[in-house]
Amino acid sequence: MSQEFLDFELPIAELEAKIEALRSVSQQDQQINLDDEITRLQKKSAELTQKTFANLDAWQVSQMARHPNRPYTLDYIEHIFTDFQTLAGDRAFADDQAIVGGLARLEERPVMIIGHQKGRSIKEKVKRNFGMPAPEGYRKALRLMQMAERFKLPIITFIDTPGAYPGVGAEERGQSEAIARNLREMSMLKVPIICTVIGEGGSGGALAIGVGDKINMLQYSTYSVISPEGCASILWKSAEKASTAAEVMGLTASRLHELKLIDSIIEEPLGGAHRNYDTMSNNLKKRLLADLADLDKLDQETLLDRRYKRLMSYGYC
């Protein structure tokens, strides 16, 4: 996968381009030794990357959460779990491709996985509806959760959506009802639920699979009631104020952790999760295993009581 850089990474991109150019020259003419210069530029690039990512603002984090090369749910399933078996359809209308789910093993332990799925190519983006589920997606998710409860399997969800699909058809089929039902039912499921925001956590579309016993966020993910552009359009009548909106919305993992709305921040590799899928997957896997170990210590009554109190505390300081 070719590396893509965001606007604020352009100085890094320029250094990386120089490195690639020198490598190309070195490969074409074996008598030219450019190793020292390449090493010097690599060191400079690493230092600049470290400096850049040490001070990201909320808008830059928002851009990172949407990075086109960022790992999606199916990427984490491939890197973390084994024996994944896809389960499809809501048994009522259709199989929404914006939500994926199924049975898998985490270190030999059977679990149920559910997550939003975006696409990379134009064709796949359309197929996945840009990660925006319709009601049938949330009903599929609920069906899988209820199946997990019957078989006493922990539920692991991965959140990455700009929001629930706002189309006319989705509204006609009961989008708000599907989201509300998931909130209610998830609060009462008698098995452990671990939710992790891996990219965008957009409004009710995220919360519909985000009611859990442990709520985690990747370092450069976001979680908010509306996008920065949407907020700016409402408050300042201009999407150009998105960077200002991002700062005041408190949508970053660090801010939400301060507010005690999430439990853990999962560190990303230098430069973001897309720079190293293996490292990111290992960090996420460690967090999931630790969370499962913690939740295994709780009896069912305590588990449900804690989860319900967490849900009811949202919006209160």
UniProtKB/Swiss-Prot annotation:
It catalyses: N(6)-carboxybiotinyl-L-lysyl-[protein] + acetyl-CoA = N(6)-biotinyl-L-lysyl-[protein] + malonyl-CoA. The gene is accA. InterPro entries: Acetyl_CoA_COase_a_su, ClpP/crotonase-like_dom_sf, COA_CT_C. Gene3D superfamilies: 2-enoyl-CoA Hydratase, Chain A, domain 1. GO terms for molecular function: acetyl-CoA carboxylase activity; ATP binding; carboxyl- or carbamoyltransferase activity. This is Acetyl-coenzyme A carboxylase carboxyl transferase subunit alpha. It holds the Pfam family ACCA. Residues 33-294 form the CoA carboxyltransferase C-terminal domain. Belongs to the AccA family. Component of the acetyl coenzyme A carboxylase (ACC) complex. First, biotin carboxylase catalyzes the carboxylation of biotin on its carrier protein (BCCP) and then the CO(2) group is transferred by the carboxyltransferase to acetyl-CoA to form malonyl-CoA. It comes from the Bacteria. PROSITE patterns: COA_CT_CTER. The keyword Lipid metabolism applies.
